[in-house]
């Protein structure tokens, strides 16, 4: 029997930024490479890094607005060109950078006529606005407008489900994701057992972090996730067959989906920027969706139960699992 020698590169792994540009105040791009890697390692690192970039990095958002002038969130206020809903959507798009812990207060207090921009927000210390020119509202008459704001730092996304009509306070859907997109690709070189790989990683951010900062934070978060495995003691668990088996009842996808949308009053714009990577789905369900070109929450909710069941290796129980996860978010 003859064994082939497997040659492994002894070169030290190196990474570098090969492209970096700022398209606007709210769009940064960076392209990085890591090499040399053994066959299969680039995909392992690329998948883990992409999920960490999109789901593990914290961001800062405006999460609530309060004003005595606002009767309800779909009303119009005399002297203001935009509806309340449009103002809340504009506040949702304000990009902030901070090192906050917990919740902080901010304030807008202006007198018309004139334009209200992000520059008019009175911020707490350690919070800065990335683009002061972002539009909030237009006052067409000489009126006073004061809006109290809540600012939070978190990760992932938060879909607010209830309004506090008594104190004129209105929630704002928050997407705490400084990284807007991340992709990886692989270049293979060499022959046979000497085949190696180069990992290319592309990162787009909203300006609150540079791609390099995002890459550093994602790497640090992944390291922290794996550290406990270095100290774990080997344990053996014995479970009886079917000890934790659960019978899952059938639930019509359409009805629960309609109720979910009514309950959360979510907007398509928010769903469009929420990737299924952030839903913490089981790997098998996640892989089935990705193979069917379902990449965002909006893609997912645009499918009926019948559409999902037609996906190869997808089951009714998987539909219920997805709904259970969505309703807890």
Curated annotation (Swiss-Prot):
GO molecular function: DNA binding; DNA-directed RNA polymerase activity; protein dimerization activity
Positions of region (Alpha C-terminal domain (alpha-CTD)): 266-329
NCBIfam families attached to this UniProt entry: rpoA (TIGR02027)
Region of interest called Alpha N-terminal domain (alpha-NTD), as start-end residue ranges on this chain: 1-233
Gene Ontology cellular-component annotations: chloroplast; chloroplast nucleoid; chloroplast stroma; chloroplast thylakoid; DNA-directed RNA polymerase complex; mitochondrion; plastid
UniProt cross-references to HAMAP family, sorted A to Z: RNApol_bact_RpoA
Enzyme Commission number(s) from the entry: 2.7.7.6
Annotated family: Belongs to the RNA polymerase alpha chain family.
Subunit structure: In plastids the minimal PEP RNA polymerase catalytic core is composed of four subunits: alpha, beta, beta', and beta''. When a (nuclear-encoded) sigma factor is associated with the core the holoenzyme is formed, which can initiate transcription.
Source superkingdom: Eukaryota
Locations listed in the record: Plastid, Chloroplast
Reactions that this protein is recorded to catalyse: RNA(n) + a ribonucleoside 5'-triphosphate = RNA(n+1) + diphosphate
Gene Ontology BP annotations: DNA-templated transcription
Protein function: DNA-dependent RNA polymerase catalyzes the transcription of DNA into RNA using the four ribonucleoside triphosphates as substrates.
Protein name: DNA-directed RNA polymerase subunit alpha
Organism this protein belongs to: Arabidopsis thaliana
């Amino acid at each position: 029997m003859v064994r082939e020698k497997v040659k492994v590169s002894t070169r030290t792994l190196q990474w570098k930024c090969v492209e970096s540009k700022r398209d606007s105040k709210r769009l940064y791009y960076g392209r990085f490479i890591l090499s040399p890697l053994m066959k299969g390692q680039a995909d392992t690192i690329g998948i883990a890094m992409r999920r960490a970039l999109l789901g593990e990095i914290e961001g800062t958002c405006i999460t609530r607005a309060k004003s005595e002038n606002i009767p309800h969130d779909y009303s119009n206020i005399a002297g203001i060109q935009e509806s309340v809903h449009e103002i809340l959507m504009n506040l949702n798009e304000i990009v902030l950078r901070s090192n906050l812990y917990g919740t902080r207060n901010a304030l807008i207090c202006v007198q018309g006529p004139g334009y209200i921009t992000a520059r008019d927000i009175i911020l707490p210390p350690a919070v800065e606005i990335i683009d002061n020119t972002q539009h909030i509202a237009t006052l067409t008459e000489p009126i006073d407008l004061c809006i109290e704001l809540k600012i939070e730092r978190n990760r992932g996304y938060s879909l607010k489900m209830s309004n506090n009509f008594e104190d004129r306070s209105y929630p704002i859907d928050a997407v705490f994701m400084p990284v807007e997109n991340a992709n990886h690709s692989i270049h293979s070189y060499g022959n046979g057992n000497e085949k190696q790989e180069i990992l290319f990683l592309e990162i787009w951010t909203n300006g609150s972090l540079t791609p390099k900062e995002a890459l550093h934070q994602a790497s640090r978060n992944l390291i922290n996730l794996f550290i406990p495995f270095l100290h774990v003691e080997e344990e053996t668990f014995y479970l009886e067959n079917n000890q934790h088996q659960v019978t899952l009842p059938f639930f019509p996808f359409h009805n629960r989906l309609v109720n979910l949308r009514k309950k959360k009053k979510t907007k398509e714009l928010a769903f469009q920027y929420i990737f299924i990577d952030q839903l913490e789905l089981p790997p098998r369900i996640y892989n089935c969706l990705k193979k069917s070109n379902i990449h965002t929450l909006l893609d997912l909710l645009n499918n009926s139960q019948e559409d999902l069941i037609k996906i190869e290796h997808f089951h009714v129980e998987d539909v219920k699992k997805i709904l259970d996860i969505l309703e807890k978010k």
